[in-house]
Amino acid sequence: MSTESGPGTRLRNLPVMGDGLETSQMSTTQAQAQPQPANAASTNPPPPETSNPNKPKRQTNQLQYLLRVVLKTLWKHQFAWPFQQPVDAVKLNLPDYYKIIKTPMDMGTIKKRLENNYYWNAQECIQDFNTMFTNCYIYNKPGDDIVLMAEALEKLFLQKINELPTEETEIMIVQAKGRGRGRKETGAAKPGVSTVPNTTQASTSPQTQTPQQNPPPPVQATTHPFPAVTPDLIAQPPVMTMVPPQPLQTPSPVPPQPPPPPAPVPQPVQSHPPIIATTPQPVKTKKGVKRKADTTTPTTIDPIHEPPSLAPEPKTAKLGPRRESSRPVKPPKKDVPDSQQHPGPEKSSKISEQLKCCSGILKEMFAKKHAAYAWPFYKPVDVEALGLHDYCDIIKHPMDMSTIKSKLESREYRDAQEFGADVRLMFSNCYKYNPPDHEVVAMARKLQDVFEMRFAKMPDEPEEPVVTVSSPAVPPPTKVVAPPSSSDSSSDSSSDSDSSTDDSEEERAQRLAELQEQLKAVHEQLAALSQPQQNKPKKKEKDKKEKKKEKHKKKEEVEENKKSKTKELPPKKTKKNNSSNSNVSKKEPVPTKTKPPPTYESEEEDKCKPMSYEEKRQLSLDINKLPGEKLGRVVHIIQSREPSLKNSNPDEIEIDFETLKPSTLRELERYVTSCLRKKRKPQAEKVDVIAGSSKMKGFSSSESESTSESSSSDSEDSETEMAPKSKKKGHTGRDQKKHHHHHHPQMQPAPAPVPQQPPPPPQQPPPPPPPQQQQQQPPPPPPPPSMPQQTAPAMKSSPPPFITAQVPVLEPQLPGSVFDPIGHFTQPILHLPQPELPPHLPQPPEHSTPPHLNQHAVVSPPALHNALPQQPSRPSNRAAALPPKPTRPPAVSPALAQPPLLPQPPMAQPPQVLLEDEEPPAPPLTSMQMQLYLQQLQKVQPPTPLLPSVKVQSQPPPPLPPPPHPSVQQQQLQPQPPPPPPPQPQPPPQQQHQPPPRPVHLPSMPFSAHIQQPPPPPGQQPTHPPPGQQPPPPQPAKPQQVIQHHPSPRHHKSDPYSAGHLREAPSPLMIHSPQMPQFQSLTHQSPPQQNVQPKKQVKGRAEPQPPGPVMGQGQGCPPASPAAVPMLSQELRPPSVVQPQPLVVVKEEKIHSPIIRSEPFSTSLRPEPPKHPENIKAPVHLPQRPEMKPVDIGRPVIRPPEQSAPPPGAPDKDKQKQEPKTPVAPKKDLKIKNMGSWASLVQKHPTTPSSTAKSSSDSFEHFRRAAREKEEREKALKAQAEHAEKEKERLRQERMRSREDEDALEQARRAHEEARRRQEQQQQQQQQRQEQQQQQQQAAAVAAASAPQAQSSQPQSMLDQQRELARKREQERRRREAMAATIDMNFQSDLLSIFEENLF
């Protein structure tokens, strides 16, 4: 009674009850726990009896489950405290409680009855629970807190009862005496008193044993009065034999329950029998140990979760040794009771948080929800029963969950790593022994997913693998013994888990809280990653031979351990890169080209700068482009680097770029770009494997990613996935680009002063080829190029460093001359101003130094092409287009690099002629384009991509002045020279005559080549220095720049623009607007030449003109100088090696833009260009609406720049033409050119050479007309073919109709003839029939003949008038259809758009 009052007082004090509800709560508590009859106004009735010596005792598997699972779970519930002891009506001041409640009941009484084997069957126990809840509902009001608490408990109770074993089987009771003794020891003199202590003990024991499953129930407070019992319970797992725990646990054998550990006392009892059936005390000890697992001894499934100890008790003697070995501490495996008692104290000592989590993980693996696929791993493999005679030979270290549980409870694991190693060893054994498609392997994968998910949530990141196989030696013996009895192993595992949980109550409470948090996290993860299993299985299958522990440790911990190593390694690698890149490498550390150590996170994180939103967006788009077979590697990269996603399902992984580490994003970027490069490389690298491949990679990456992202990703990708290739290609391609720049500056250190001198320009003709050769040569200097490999942003920001590193001397010139040759070659792209001024200065030196190179370039166009494509990769936006040019000869690379723009649709129609003409020249273009690409890359690489493009365009304008024309021609020749060395010699003289123009033409060639300016910067810089030449080129350059800059979206298109060869469909617009402006400028400078060229181009438009015009106009070289124009026209007609390059440009454009195909070339070549600068932007875009969209975007952008920076664009351009002081003006022109380059070009051309403008416009119109006619013809032919087919079908139908009509007529005739002359009619009918048949056959033949002739007249008139009428009808129908079909609205709209464009 006193004890009861104590609990009652606690109840009042507990905060769970509301203030106003204390009485009701107390009453509820009393009602629930009412052990005493309703005697109590002043005194409480005696509690219900918990034992009856006269009543036979009985233990069943269901009762065991009720004790170990149901009662244990309810006892630990936070609302259980009011029901843990009989209602104390005196303390709670409930005088009427026992009057209303005649059969009081509480969980404390139920627990004692279960422990004392009081119930005969489970129904009696369930009835007591129902009585307890009913009493609460009867006595208390519906809304009271105590009622709500009872409802919550009842709900949980019903859930657990649903899992009750279906069949009730009796279990031997070996512990009756022990239990009685235990009670006596505990001193249960009074039933009431004994009930309270039992309750407290039970509550404490469950807390200690199963802290993980449930939070410590409030009952713990009540249980404190019996601290002596709690220590016993804590010690119980090991010391289960101890008497004090036994009294509490004596009744526990009845309920076995694996899932909830709340009923620790009963479980120990059950677990004991399996371990030691002979000795009652040992059984008790084991009860405490195996609370959970022993619950379902009778059922096979239950034993898996929690093997029932009571049911196997008879078998326990056999299994005892094995079980004991698994359960007890290593030393006393067989002496379970004693050894467990001793280990008990050890276990009572604090277990590390990680090991506590391990115990929780193991319990979850034993849970019923996983039983469907976990059951094969519950017990050691029974080699004899399964007939697996070779198992022990293959599997040297068997392992199973029961063995792991016993080792965990016996404290054999020093840390979580050993535990994880054994679990993974168990799975790896399964994967090793069984075939991959075996169902057991699938089950192991599922279970391992559960394990890994929980193991990853370990509090202190204990996942660091400590590949420790300490357990294997022990597990094999246990396994060998274990196979005989499954129930024993299950019971052992349950007892082990219970014992592992047995610690001080405080530890339990902490554990429970932690475990709940972990469970929540795990559930959230499971929900998010619905299928993480497949990923793990794949890894495990791969590493079947390797132990799971080792593998995971390597993956998880090795990464962390290697992080420090990687920090050290990256410097070494960077050193290598620096050595390879020399000057450039220093800047690359930021991109961190950690090719070998992509796996090292710390290193990469240190080096990898975070991705911008644009980069992440581009990366997402690129990942979506990858083929299915490449996505597995993406998932692997993410999972290997992101601990939170390690257990995610690879098939349904969800990637949030915001949560991924920078190193992971960069690694993904490298991989994706490398994959995309591989797709495009085959074509791009056909010409130049080393340089081309890296540049193509860069190009593809730039296409897919922003400029900065593409460059960084390129470097990273080459480093990570293609360490060798990245070194070669990265250095050769990217680095070659920069190296070429560097080498050019170095080659041009002397030319640097020349930039402003006109003489250097004459020398420039040779330099363009040398740039190409230099590009070829740069591959050898890839070491320095590693720096260029840096991201495009790095390139932009680091151009000065590159310049300084490569040509310190040249750098000074840069400041002085606005652009130093070094700047151009090294990072001319970085400095927009450089391209304008220094392009001219450096170009002469380059050309002068590389005249030989020019010849070499001709010889080695493929290598140059490779270099060029690589260069484009750097100036992610503009260089990308250029790379396609070099690749273009292969025809594959263009598709790879530029297909994104709009190349594909246009390629369909006009490209045929262009391709025919241009493809042969493609190789020459490659050499020229190599040079141009290097230059363009350099220019494009300048700090701002837009500026680089402007530079390119600004330089192309220089051709506008007459002096530039020769230079332009020379440049064209130079590009051509690669195929024919003789043409190169010609360009040099022209350049000499007009040094500034030549540089200008080089820029325009870059323009056509899409930014040959980078080459012109070295070679052109001298050209720009000539004031007369430079001002005009900037204007043409403006359109190009505009296009190129705006093309940032059409990144690649802009390149095609500048270099029509670039195989980019967008080129049509580009050709018209950029090339046209340049051409116009050229035309103005040399009207006769332009006129000649446009005419020639018009004549040879189909073949030479496309290439030539594109080259000439796009580059501005041919039109630029009078000599150049004739050269272009001549070369265009005979797609000579020199011409091929221009042809390539045109080809690209034509192919890409169907509408512009025929006309764009002529337009670009003709005086129309002036119109195109402004008008063509829209008109050209209109024809190529799909393809031109990028161009349209670019052009609008171009116009604003022109307006903003070049409002004085026209005057500036004119000034540039007149003044050689383009160094400073070009910068302004860069923007102005973008804005008013087209307008200024249009104005310039009309102002300077009106005759040329007219001639060009005339030729352009002719070209348009020819193109229109050609298109109309093609459409007409198509329509005719379609009509013919339709007519054939009609004829067939008509034949059928005519036959029917004839039959009807024949019948009518027959009737009339029969009336007149039956005989004659019959004869006539026969004849008619024969005739009709013949006629039908004839008609069919005629129809067949006429069907092919869709538009031809209908078959000859039929004998029948009706037939003739029908045929006439059909003919009319056909005519109508033919007329309707001839009118193609799409075709008409295209024609109108072309016409409107021409009007401008």
Swiss-Prot record:
One of its GO terms (biological process) is positive regulation of G2/M transition of mitotic cell cycle. Changing Y431C: Reduced acetylated histone binding. Reduced binding to promoters and enhancers of BRD4 target genes. There is a cross-link at K1147 (Glycyl lysine isopeptide (Lys-Gly) (interchain with G-Cter in SUMO1)). Residues 601-683 form the NET domain. Keywords: Acetylation, Bromodomain, Chromatin regulator, Chromosome, Isopeptide bond, Nucleus, Phosphoprotein, Repeat, Transcription, Transcription regulation, Ubl conjugation. One of its GO terms (molecular function) is chromatin binding. SUPFAM superfamilies: Bromodomain (SSF47370). The modification Phosphoserine is found at S471, S485, S489, S493, S495, S499, S500, S504, S602, S1153, S1162, S1237, S1240. Chromatin reader protein that recognizes and binds acetylated histones and plays a key role in transmission of epigenetic memory across cell divisions and transcription regulation. Remains associated with acetylated chromatin throughout the entire cell cycle and provides epigenetic memory for postmitotic G1 gene transcription by preserving acetylated chromatin status and maintaining high-order chromatin structure. During interphase, plays a key role in regulating the transcription of signal-inducible genes by associating with the P-TEFb complex and recruiting it to promoters. This is Bromodomain-containing protein 4. It comes from Mus musculus (Mouse). The lineage of its organism: Eukaryota, Metazoa, Chordata, Craniata, Vertebrata.
